[in-house]
């Protein structure tokens, strides 16, 4: 038997990163651990969707997508937008005591902002909702959506803006 699967994805226009920087909070108890800030300006057309990822050079084998990495412009269309991001570790990485979730002075980080189409955003959103609700007996059941007809998974075209941040 022949199984046919079909998928399509629209390559959206690139939305460049305006700035990315490493920030140690004023309330920090460790002067070498901080957060990553990224900003961009959303185009004035409603319906843009994004995904964010990061990779520590020489430490992470690939870009890491944290939970909550996908969003759209329904809450801020056509305006500058800045957000702070914690560091997610790669699978099975042991974190030193007190350093989980923080970037560290001396890290060189590639920050990537991806413009994705609405179908990809919707599929990713159902996946993230399902993963974040695991083990919660009060969470409603979630069916993870796919944008592949006749199959499971995602077919995603993305335009990416990448910035390099030196954590100093």
Where are these regions (language model features)?
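A sequence/structural signal for flexible, mid-protein segments enriched
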Residues: 1-168
């Amino acid at each position: 038997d022949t199984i046919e699967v079909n998928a399509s994805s629209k390559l959206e226009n690139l939305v460049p990163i305006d700035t990315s920087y490493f920030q140690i909070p004023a309330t920090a108890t460790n002067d070498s651990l901080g957060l990553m800030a990224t900003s961009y300006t959303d185009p004035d057309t409603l319906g843009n969707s994004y995904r964010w990822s990061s990779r520590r050079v020489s430490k992470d084998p690939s870009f890491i997508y944290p939970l909550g990495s996908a969003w759209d412009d329904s809450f801020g269309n056509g305006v500058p937008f800045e957000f702070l991001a914690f560091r997610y570790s790669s699978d099975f990485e042991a974190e030193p005591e007190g350093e989980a979730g923080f970037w560290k002075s001396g890290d060189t980080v590639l920050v990537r902002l991806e413009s994705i189409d609405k179908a990809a955003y919707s599929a990713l959103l159902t996946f993230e909702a399902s993963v974040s609700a695991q083990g919660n007996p009060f969470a409603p059941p979630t069916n993870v959506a796919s944008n592949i007809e006749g199959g499971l998974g995602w077919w995603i075209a993305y335009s990416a803006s990448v910035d390099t941040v030196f954590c100093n």
